[in-house]
Amino acid sequence: MKIADLMTLLDHHVPFSTAESWDNVGLLIGDEDVEVTGVLTALDCTLEVVNEAIEKGYNTIISHHPLIFKGVTSLKANGYGLIIRKLIQHDINLIAMHTNLDVNPYGVNMMLAKAMGLKNISIINNQQDVYYKVQTYIPKDNVGPFKDKLSENGLAQEGNYEYCFFESEGRGQFKPVGEANPTIGQIDKIEYVDEVKIEFMIDAYQKSRAEQLIKQYHPYETPVFDFIEIKQTSLYGLGVMAEVDNQMTLEDFAADIKSKLNIPSVRFVGESNQKIKRIAIIGGSGIGYEYQAVQQGADVFVTGDIKHHDALDAKIHGVNLIDINHYSEYVMKEGLKTLLMNRFNTEKINIDVEASTINTDPFQYI
């Protein structure tokens, strides 16, 4: 398997297009044409993680947090530059799966919920997928070759199906005037043509390409075509809603997940004895969604990186919070390893995948 093949597999199951627009995901450092010798999953790509990959003989690291996030202005032998230089010197490929793994139905938030032992887990804050239904009108004799060209260029595909068109027949009319150069008809004379309306679906990113192809292969000088926007609730969303088997107090629940996640500290906002049943989770830094979570029926909102004033606001408004620290996302190391191994086993791909043993939490606890 080459890096390009691994990227295709990852994109199929955890699409990079579902990442936030500000994010930096995908192949950050590497060569798509090299063979994968092994994969190391990590929360952060630190120098220690790079050394671990080198020791194992693995040439691919998949990290959750992007090492390169903003524009790089220099690569010196210190700080982040040292990490990047070492990756390049040892021909190690670095792939980032950040917010695309956050919003995935099997991603970070699902991994956290399962690690906490929760039940009835479902995605919340679902994304909206944008599609377009394209329709254009073409003379009956040109239908076949026109559809062939669209299909050859990747349009009119639905999952594992290609050449997905709908046709309806009708009668078109037009009158060429002035300096027109009509394929059919004569200047200043109304022409009637048996036409077919062709309809097909495209993804949002294909819109400009579809317009280009229609203009290129349609027999008319000025073809008529429409893009009708369709929005559909996506399977992807930022966060999950889940439940404990039996009601428990806020303090007991906080202590329970501290133990199950094996993290050194947990903070919570709310009355210690308040009963908890439904839990909303956004791993990492999810403040800003806490009130929406309550509106969706959550008894407590679990996230990390909660600041003082956000916690105070929540307390004043009666919103229960639990801060499990940003590093709690470390569960993705084993979770992503499992996802990859399942796919590799299904497709009979013999490549080692290991979760990094390096703790990249920058904090020390006393």
Swiss-Prot record:
Positions bound to Zn(2+) 2: 65, 326, 329
One Gene Ontology cellular component annotation held by this UniProt entry: cytoplasm
InterPro entries assigned to the protein according to its UniProt record, in alphabetical order: DUF34/NIF3, DUF34/NIF3_bac, DUF34/NIF3_sf, N-reg_PII/ATP_PRibTrfase_C
Annotated GO MF terms: metal ion binding
Pfam families for this protein: DUF34_NIF3
Extent of the signal sequence: none
UniProt binding sites for Zn(2+) 1: 64, 102, 329
Keyword annotations of the record: Metal-binding, Zinc
PANTHER family given in the database record: GTP CYCLOHYDROLASE 1 TYPE 2 HOMOLOG (PTHR13799:SF14), NGG1 INTERACTING FACTOR 3 (PTHR13799)
Family: Belongs to the GTP cyclohydrolase I type 2/NIF3 family.
Subunit organization: Homohexamer.
NCBIfam families the UniProt entry points to: YbgI_SA1388
Protein's name according to its UniProt entry: GTP cyclohydrolase 1 type 2 homolog
Lineage of producing organism: Bacteria, Bacillati, Bacillota, Bacilli, Bacillales
